[in-house]
Amino acid sequence: MSRIIMLIPTGTSVGLTSVSLGVIRAMERKGVRLSVFKPIAQPRTGGDAPDQTTTIVRANSSTTTAAEPLKMSYVEGLLSSNQKDVLMEEIVANYHANTKDAEVVLVEGLVPTRKHQFAQSLNYEIAKTLNAEIVFVMSQGTDTPEQLKERIELTRNSFGGAKNTNITGVIVNKLNAPVDEQGRTRPDLSEIFDDSSKAKVNNVDPAKLQESSPLPVLGAVPWSFDLIATRAIDMARHLNATIINEGDINTRRVKSVTFCARSIPHMLEHFRAGSLLVTSADRPDVLVAACLAAMNGVEIGALLLTGGYEMDARISKLCERAFATGLPVFMVNTNTWQTSLSLQSFNLEVPVDDHERIEKVQEYVANYINADWIESLTATSERSRRLSPPAFRYQLTELARKAGKRIVLPEGDEPRTVKAAAICAERGIATCVLLGNPAEINRVAASQGVELGAGIEIVDPEVVRESYVGRLVELRKNKGMTETVAREQLEDNVVLGTLMLEQDEVDGLVSGAVHTTANTIRPPLQLIKTAPGSSLVSSVFFMLLPEQVYVYGDCAINPDPTAEQLAEIAIQSADSAAAFGIEPRVAMLSYSTGTSGAGSDVEKVREATRLAQEKRPDLMIDGPLQYDAAVMADVAKSKAPNSPVAGRATVFIFPDLNTGNTTYKAVQRSADLISIGPMLQGMRKPVNDLSRGALVDDIVYTIALTAIQSAQQQ
């Protein structure tokens, strides 16, 4: 039977959607089979528009289901005709029709607004009807812990008081947020106007909040400035602006708003990464200054021109190179004052199509939800947990945090690498050592609005390179290495980073955002060598499918492994899967299953399976298996009924590189899924390669993988 948790907001602007998304992510991390149930749609725009939480869950989660809520107009019609009983019956019917397979059902209540003053009484009725456990969601505002205590008590009393044993706890959102004079945490751009620093902030210790609360505090979520950074395109849409230069309008984030009414020298401090610069279109000096900043690497959020003046063609020509850097420029017909008023009404709630921000909100809020409470929701369930993609990513970061490793990044001045290093430092994933010119690295960081603080080290190759010449000569003397050649090779930061790893100055190396796979792997193979007991280096990809994570090997290194090599690849891959929380059930893949086929290719897989089983009888390995027999239970029953792996494989070993690489790319592209890797196996020390098209998140997770590998090799 499902556990039913109902999140009930105590007022407006509590951030209900953000809290719901965070709780969903916290449950997904634990592999909970979850369903989201919004009984009644309550779109912010009013009317019968799609419900925000339901739409976001459907668009962004492959493991959580969300039922279609009843339309508000229909509900209001039932209530006005005194048919509440009919409404409750429909809610129950909708609930049962859409939540049958869920372990936990998360119900999102209605927000009490001026238009929906019946919200709380209806929330109470729904909670009683579904026999749901109630969790209140509130924001702090200007309240002290004592005032919050009183507010929690009053809210509990309106839902039956202490006698209502279904009241489980409270989640306090926007803790220590800046508020206005009326105590409101305003969901509009006033939070990021340049004068927002004047806002009042209450510094409440979450521990004291727990002590004073009459209900268990199941989450205390600090307000975060980063979560309200909106895209430039969202502002352009809100203003119905004409786009002059699209640039990176879909990805650039606005973190501050500046009205450029002063002379240039008095505004330069505001020409920074993430700034929305608002100026009259007849101020070419501001436009040119912004373009100069962009050409110097400053990622200004966007430039908004007011007044409706046509841009001078000569100025437009002058700014072409700046526009090519990705600077978004858009224009409105209203004057600056009218534009200011329009910006004030911009709502900072996360748009349903802003997947990057949704992911950030989910991860951030989930980190502040009580883990013991989440664990307790399925404590009595006997079903084995699947490792979903969110659970896998969370596990990666947690294991990396515990490892506490130093990872060298030879491409230290590459923009994506710098961003990834900052994220790793912020999350405590690893200490990142950036190789490169310190001034250039700091310039790249500043241009992207990235702070390089604790958890990041910068090593100047020009300063340290000479100290590694002797060691390189010693390691490669049998290959005729001389000091002159060693100095030439050490001009390559990958070689330098590899020597740092070889001498235990760092714990792992990640490269490839700029370098080829060969350039990344060759120096470690020459200088680090294979691990004891390993005769070869292989690789795996972690394939983040909608409901679970698969391991594919080897799709990147060995072109045509022998049966002995294939057996070792299988064992290495199984151990890698287990190390990252995936129960290894290894399928040795071929074009035929069992004894149905013959030929050298099938015999190689059959022999590799036998060798792997002999070497590691503790592992669940079977083959030859066709891919469909390995993953589909119904096919497995007919093709391999006695196989312990068929129908539920988690590790897939391909017979050669051609098959493996083709399959990995076909699955990744056709299913539009995330893959992490290749992760190298069999090295004496961890080294990992990146795709040259790697995103920042790809680099972050590869750094985490590398840190975990280092911890496991000790």
Curated annotation (Swiss-Prot):
InterPro entries: DRTGG, P-Actrans_bac, P-loop_NTPase, P_AcTrfase, P_AcTrfase_dom1, P_AcTrfase_dom2, Phos_Acetyltrans/Butyryltrans, PTA_PTB. Residues 391-714 are annotated as: Phosphate acetyltransferase. It catalyses: acetyl-CoA + phosphate = acetyl phosphate + CoA. It is found in: Cytoplasm. GO terms for molecular function: phosphate acetyltransferase activity; zinc ion binding. Inhibited by NADH and ATP. Pyruvate and PEP act as activators of the acetyl phosphate forming reaction while inhibiting the formation of acetyl-CoA. GO terms for biological process: acetate biosynthetic process; acetate catabolic process; acetate metabolic process; acetyl-CoA biosynthetic process from acetate; L-threonine catabolic process to propionate. Pathway: Metabolic intermediate biosynthesis; acetyl-CoA biosynthesis; acetyl-CoA from acetate: step 2/2. PANTHER family: PHOSPHATE ACETYLTRANSFERASE. This is Phosphate acetyltransferase. It comes from Escherichia coli (strain K12). The lineage of its organism: Bacteria, Pseudomonadati, Pseudomonadota, Gammaproteobacteria, Enterobacterales. The gene is pta.
